[in-house]
């Protein structure tokens, strides 16, 4: 297995240069005009409270004009943020932690979706006839993950080691979430860590089953992602940052209580079939900005050398 830190080195080095070169400057606006904020995000349920905040007018009520740029990957979002093409972007905790330790001045300004053992949106699946019950049963097997050296690998390697297996013997195969169900069915992989809505589609085929809530090995609750900007942007736009955070927290509270209504909003942005969105487990959004929800991911990532060392979660949060 490739050393996780090596997989990040070139990209992170490029980001450092881009951040230094760009500088974050607020978009000029007339006194009575809303402040434009360019936000990068994927069309995923884990960011759907952003869509809710726009549709419900939470940003507009605070004098913000949030313009979404839908992007295909977290790496693309980070590069755009570093280069000054975005003001705010969504990022998972492992990626942001790695960037922080490389000296890239990214900081979380609002929480995103959290893993919740009572309503998991990412699960480990296996073939329907698989005998897998513990990590030992997966030793030496092929395992599908969305990205190497990231959350989708951190969950299973932690679970495998904590249930009698040896995560270092696993061959982790990077693949799109949408293709994981088919990969299980073909026998290309013996298990996979699948997020919604691909999870719902894979299970509906009847060829796969849930084998474990692998993220439970990290913690029963932890932050999956959040909203980052540069420290320079925070310094120059403190009021806008506070307003953005407040709007996102209001949207989180609304979304957690209104799954059906928020699903209708999400359908406007997602490429997933409407019936899949209706059936899948919806994301749980953090209703407070709590460093304790970030810390388990940082600690586990450091243990498995996905990042160089552990550090206090507060170091990457602008509270």
Please report, for each region that a protein language model flagged, where it lies by residue.
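Short, low-complexity disordered leader/linker segments with a strong preference
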Residues: 1-36
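Short, glycine-/small- and polar/acidic-enriched structural segments
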Residues: 31-163, 174, 190-196, 210-212, ...
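Soluble non-cytosolic domains of exported or imported proteins
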Residues: 44, 71-75, 90, 150-151, ...
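Short, solvent-exposed loop/beta-turn-alpha elements that line the ligand-binding surface or hinge
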Residues: 61, 115-117, 216-219, 284-293, ...
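Pocket-lining segment of extracytoplasmic ligand-binding domains
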Residues: 94, 178-265
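Short helix-loop capping/hinge motifs at secondary-structure junctions, enriched
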Residues: 128-136, 165-167, 232-241
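Secondary-structure end/capping motifs
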Residues: 235-306
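Conserved C-terminal helix/tail region of periplasmic/extracytoplasmic solute-binding proteins
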Residues: 301-319
């Amino acid at each position: 297995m490739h050393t996780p830190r090596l997989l990040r080195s070139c990209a992170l080095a490029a980001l450092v240069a881009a951040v230094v070169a760009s500088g974050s400057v607020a978009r000029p606006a007339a006194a009575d005009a809303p402040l434009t904020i360019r936000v990068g995000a994927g069309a995923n349920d884990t960011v759907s409270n952003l869509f809710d905040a726009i549709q419900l007018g939470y940003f507009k009520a605070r004098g913000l004009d949030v313009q979404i740029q839908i992007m295909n990957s977290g790496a693309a979002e980070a590069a755009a943020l570093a280069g000054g093409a975005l003001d705010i972007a969504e990022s998972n905790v492992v990626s942001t932690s790695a960037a922080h330790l490389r000296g890239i001045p990214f900081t979380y300004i609002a929480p995103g979706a959290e893993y919740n053992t009572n309503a998991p949106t990412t699960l480990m699946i296996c073939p329907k006839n698989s005998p897998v019950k513990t990590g030992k049963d997966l030793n030496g097997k092929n395992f599908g993950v969305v990205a190497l050296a990231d959350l989708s690998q951190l969950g299973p390697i932690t679970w495998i080691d904590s249930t009698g297996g040896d995560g270092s013997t696993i061959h982790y195969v990077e693949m799109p979430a949408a293709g994981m169900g088919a990969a299980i069915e073909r026998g290309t992989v013996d298990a996979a860590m699948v997020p919604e809505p691909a999870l719902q589609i894979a299970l509906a085929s009847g060829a796969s089953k849930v084998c474990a809530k692998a993220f439970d090995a990290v913690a029963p609750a932890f932050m999956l992602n959040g909203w980052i900007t540069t420290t320079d942007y925070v310094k120059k736009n403190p009021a806008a940052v506070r307003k953005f955070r407040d709007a996102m927290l209001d949207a989180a509270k609304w979304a957690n209580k209104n799954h059906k209504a928020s699903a209708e909003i999400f359908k406007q942005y997602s490429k997933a079939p409407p019936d899949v969105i209706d059936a899948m487990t919806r994301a749980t959004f953090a209703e407070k900005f709590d460093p304790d929800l970030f810390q388990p991911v940082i600690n586990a990532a450091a243990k498995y050398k996905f990042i160089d060392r552990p550090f206090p979660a507060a170091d990457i949060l602008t509270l």
